[in-house]
Curated annotation (Swiss-Prot):
Pfam families referenced in this protein's UniProt entry, alphabetically: Hema_esterase, Hema_HEFG
Name assigned to this protein: Hemagglutinin-esterase
GO MF entry, a single one: host cell surface receptor binding
Keyword annotations from UniProtKB, A to Z: Disulfide bond, Glycoprotein, Hemagglutinin, Host cell membrane, Host membrane, Hydrolase, Membrane, Signal, Transmembrane, Transmembrane helix, Viral envelope protein, Virion
UniProt organism field: Murine coronavirus (strain JHM)
Residue numbers annotated as active site: S45, D342, H345
Annotated signal sequence range: 1-22
Similarity comment text for this entry: Belongs to the influenza type C/coronaviruses hemagglutinin-esterase family.
GO CC annotation: host cell plasma membrane; membrane; viral envelope; virion membrane
Length: 439
């Protein structure tokens, strides 16, 4: 029986390797997944299990998320919202979550379809740029931190003027940053204004620093009727570091000279005491911040494309923001096409993509998720976890051309296997000879 096992093992091994090479075994899968149970997802209605409706549709039919994950405790999602929307506007949801492997499937609820402009003759493209810069900062930082939440930023302003809401469009009202009105004892906006704010309780904070990107005209209370160039900065009073920028474009807020809107940069600031300074026009300062806590070993985030069905206008800003090495982007090639709920919810292909959250995988890489850690035809780029070695399969040749590292590893394993086989053969031959001699 021992000789039979020795004879079958090499054939079985060759058969398994042959099947892997011929049929593309362990190819990267276009899914989002995780290496273990230490993961978390931030989403919108497509992963919001708490959404309630009374339109007669089947329960949870709006989800792209598998309903089995609804009670996992690993989802922070809100119908009609997004991280960007909550960060800047009064329409707020307190996104909160923690994990080693972070997944984002949101962003579509602030898109060209909404057409937000800060001013009547503003520019929605400015806000698409803001969106891209915001998510780039969030993705970069969440590759380094476990925990994300929102916090309010307290400030102290020594003047008499009150906060003002100057950025409104349809249902959206901007409240981050906060703008301080012009002091009544000044004739125009040519004066320096400042306020102090404190960041405490988190390892880092993401805050907005924004300016109007062109010529801002004074209000009706400004008898000079002048145009102003916005200038804003934040000064760290503990370290002496200054962050700031000025408006640079030749645009305004009139029908003949349109395009004036808010341009934001998203700073990652450490805890401390800060001073917000405006040299001209309105003082602005952060009212909310994203709180980053619990540094971790670097682990790229996974971002699922968040877009509408083609009947609505979408953008690709999350794709623009999702860059290597801190982010892996996942998408489908087909138009988003919802099922029983509406065309914007319950897409079959996106449900397949998110189904990877039901299981652990061995490796997560740029190309996708690898189920196993043995051999694949694709070398995992930027791989994390226990990743497979790769073989470059030459279908037009009778042999496979392996990458150097896998060849060395497989050669060592093959040598060890040969030694074991020779040892077993000699052992059984010697043992059989002894038994024949004794008989």
């Amino acid at each position: 029986m021992g000789s039979t096992c020795i004879a079958m093992a090499p054939r079985t091994l060759l058969l398994l390797i042959g099947c892997q090479l011929v049929f593309g075994f362990n190819e990267p899968l276009n899914i989002v997944s995780h290496l273990n149970d230490d993961w978390f997802l931030f989403g919108d209605s497509r992963s919001d299990c708490t959404y309630v409706e009374n339109n007669g549709h089947p329960k949870l039919d709006w989800l792209d998320l598998d309903p089995k994950l609804c009670n996992s405790g690993k989802i922070s999602a809100k119908s009609g919202n997004s991280l960007f929307r909550s960060f800047h506007f009064t329409d707020f949801y307190n996104y909160t979550g923690e994990g080693d492997q972070i997944v984002f499937y949101e962003g579509v609820n602030f898109s060209p379809n909404h057409g937000f402009k800060c001013l009547a003759y503003g520019d929605n493209k400015r806000w698409m740029g803001n969106k891209a810069r915001f998510y780039a900062r969030v993705y970069e930082k969440m590759a380094q931190y476990r925990s994300l939440s929102f916090v309010n930023v307290p400030y102290a302003y020594g003047g008499k003027a009150k906060p003002t809401s100057i950025c409104k469009h349809k249902t959206l009202t901007l409240n981050n940053p906060t703008f301080i009105s012009k002091e009544s004892n000044y004739v125009d906006y040519y004066y320096e204004s400042e306020a102090n704010f404190t960041l405490a309780g988190c390892d880092e904070f993401i805050v907005p620093l924004c300016v109007f990107n062109g010529h801002s005209k004074g209000s009706s209370s400004d008898p000079a009727n002048k145009y102003y160039m916005d200038s804003q900065s934040y000064y760290n009073m503990d370290t002496g570091v200054l962050y700031g920028f000025n408006s640079t474009l030749d645009v305004g807020n009139t029908a003949k000279d349109p395009g004036l809107d808010l341009t934001c940069r998203y700073l990652a600031l450490t805890p401390g005491n800060y001073k917000a300074v405006s040299l001209e026009y309105l003082l602005s300062l952060p009212s909310k911040a994203i709180c980053l806590r619990k540094p971790k070993r670097f682990m790229p985030v996974q971002v699922v494309d968040s877009r509408w069905n083609s009947t609505r206008q979408s953008d690709n800003m999350t794709a623009v923001a999702c860059q290597l090495p801190y982010c892996f982007f996942r998408n489908t090639s087909a138009d988003y096409s919802g099922g029983t709920h509406d065309v914007h919810h319950g897409d079959f292909h996106f449900r397949q993509l998110l189904s990877g959250l039901l299981l652990n995988v061995s490796c997560i890489a740029q190309q996708g998720a690898f189920l196993y850690n043995n051999v694949s035809s694709s070398w995992p780029a930027y791989g994390y976890g226990q990743c497979p070695t790769a073989a470059n399969i030459g279908y037009m040749a009778p042999v496979c051309i392996y990458d150097p590292l896998p060849v060395v590893l497989l050669g060592v394993l093959l040598g060890i296997a040969v030694l074991i086989i020779v040892f077993l053969i000699l052992y059984f031959m010697t043992d059989s000879g002894v038994r024949l001699h004794e008989a």
